[in-house]
Regions:
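Catalytic cores of nucleotide-sugar-dependent glycosyltransferases that transfer UDP/GDP/TDP-activated
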Residues: 1-312
Length: 312
């Protein structure tokens, strides 16, 4: 899109051009490579880091678009700072993300969809784990792009593990990691148990995941779940389940869209390190689901500055 804007700017200058960046490619890359983006923000040179991280082509197009379009915008104050430092161009205006409010069901339809979502989530968990789940279990989730550190997936797993081992849990908890990965196929054993309503009495093989992956041995989520010592045994108060498919209603296991899953949650957690805005916590709040975000997310910073308490 940036290249298109540059082409129009040169060939048809009578047409006004606008470029909105929802992140900077070099900022995302710095954060994803375990470098301290925010602690040393004022010391980074975008061109130098692009060369170091092999991001020169993408960074160059992005930078030229920022400098030469008629109007350059971004979605949050934290990303505006990033643009100024790494692209050498402050946005002309910050336009916070948002969406129309009418995509959330209301009244009886909301209650119906929430009940259906909880029933589906708990049923899949029971088939996978081979044990009963309390109908009133606390269902919590995280979701987003598979950026293990940037999206705080590692922090989410660690937080769930601390809760699991705290010895203070009174209520059963099922934590879902709804992050698309390199899926090979929906699990045939789990799919059969769901479709034929087979009551499983023992956990399925690798009872942490709903779909098989191409790269199971190298998957960071599965490896950290195992490293942390999760067992998903019936005796454990907290279970964790990785849902690595796109939730488009055709995944083969849940067969529900993301929103039709989100509505069944009791809480969501998005502990992002790099999050220019953060649709996920905003969507969660829109659905009436309490959420945790961070003060490094654009939405988190906006909420902290703009609204608080009951006004949120």
């Amino acid at each position: 899109l940036a290249m298109g804007a540059l082409y129009i700017q040169k060939q048809i200058p009578a047409i006004a051009t606008l470029f909105t960046t929802h992140a900077t490619s070099i900022g995302r890359s710095i954060a994803g490579n375990n470098k301290a983006l925010y602690a040393y923000m004022d010391g980074y040179n975008g061109d130098q880091m692009a060369k170091e991280l092999n991001m020169e082509a993408k960074h160059s197009v992005e930078k030229q678009a920022a400098h030469y379009v008629d109007c350059f915008t971004t979605v949050s104050d934290i990303t505006a700072r990033e643009c100024k430092q790494l692209l050498d161009k402050a946005p002309d205006i910050v336009t916070p993300n948002g969406f129309e409010p009418n995509f959330v069901p209301e009244g009886k339809e909301y209650a119906k969809k929430r009940k259906e979502a909880r029933r589906t989530l708990i049923n899949v968990a029971e088939k996978l784990l081979g044990c009963s789940i309390d109908p009133n279990a606390l269902l919590v989730s995280t979701s987003g792009r598979y950026e293990y550190r940037n999206k705080g997936i590692d922090v989410f797993i660690e937080a769930m593990n601390r809760v699991r081992t705290s010895g203070r849990l009174q209520r059963e908890v099922v934590a879902f990691i709804m992050v698309p990965a390199w899926v090979r196929a929906a699990r045939a054993d789990l799919k059969e148990a769901i479709e034929q309503d087979i009551k499983t009495t023992s956990p399925l093989q690798i009872p942490f995941i709903t779909h098989w992956l191409h790269n199971m041995p190298e998957d960071k989520v599965l490896n950290y779940i195992n490293h942390a010592g999760f067992t998903n045994a019936a005796s454990e108060k907290l279970k964790i389940i990785f849902v690595p498919c796109y939730l488009d209603g055709k995944g083969g296991i849940f067969n529900k869209t993301y929103y039709d899953m989100l509505i069944g949650m009791d809480a969501t957690v998005y502990p992002s390190y790099y999050e220019p805005w953060g649709y996920t916590p905003l969507e969660s709040i829109a659905f009436g689901i309490p959420t945790i975000t961070t003060n490094l997310a654009g939405f988190g910073m906006w909420a902290k500055k703009t609204v608080s308490g009951d006004n949120l």
